[in-house]
Design a protein with these regions (language model features):
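Feature marking long nucleic-acid-engaging regions of large polymerase/nuclease enzymes
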Residues: 19-196
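Extended, highly charged
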Residues: 1-17
Length: 196
């Protein structure tokens, strides 16, 4: 099922978006941190409203017009307003650093969590002789092959994405909310489903 999530004051259309409902333990509404920016949510006691859609037609219309995926790009300046914050950016930074190796077990767990069904990256040996994946190879798997991009990261490193293959360290300028060049390119080129 889907429901409309809202944080007042509703200053723009991204103040009300449709989320897929998943029932969990506890008595609080929870949502992915990536959508904090459009809601202007900062977890200091923000009140959020949940509107349950009554009819099947209204649910279908809301899915088409108001899904979070349809609002990754803001109409204000055309950039990605929904994007990585906090742990998303830290994880991308750590994975994309040169020399980062992830054990095959952890790499397969990460790829399984995103539903990856494609081919796997090349297996390399770490300093202890264990099978591992390079962090940049794991990131390159999930970036579409038609993405070609060059930009400077916030740490002044050159980031190059060619045919979906990443070279350079990813940070907020790559995947961050309101600044994510890579995220913006994926959404602009391949649509909101791929960007999400």
């Amino acid at each position: 099922d889907v429901a409309i999530f809202n944080r007042q004051p509703s200053l723009h259309r991204m103040s009300m978006m449709v989320h897929e409902v998943r029932v969990m333990q506890g008595h609080t509404f929870r949502f992915n941190l990536a959508v904090c920016t459009p809601y202007n949510a900062d977890f200091d006691g923000d009140e959020m409203n949940l509107h349950v859609i009554q009819s099947e037609e209204a649910r279908a219309e809301a899915k088409i017009l108001m899904r979070v995926q349809e609002h990754i790009l803001t109409p204000r300046y055309g950039g990605a307003v929904i994007g990585g914050i906090h742990d998303h950016i830290s994880g991308a930074y750590l994975l994309s650093r040169p020399g980062t190796l992830i054990s095959v077990e952890h790499g397969l767990e990460m790829l399984g969590n995103i539903g990856w069904t494609g081919s796997l990256p090349e297996v390399v040996k770490d300093q202890n002789g264990r099978d591992s994946f390079r962090g940049q190879d794991i990131i390159s798997l999930i970036i579409p092959d038609n993405i070609h991009l060059r930009f400077r990261s916030r740490s002044n490193d050159d980031v190059v994405v060619k045919n979906g293959s990443v070279e350079g360290i990813l940070d907020k300028r790559a995947i961050g909310a309101e600044d994510g060049r890579l995220l913006d390119a994926i959404v602009q080129t391949n649509g909101p489903e791929q960007g999400a």
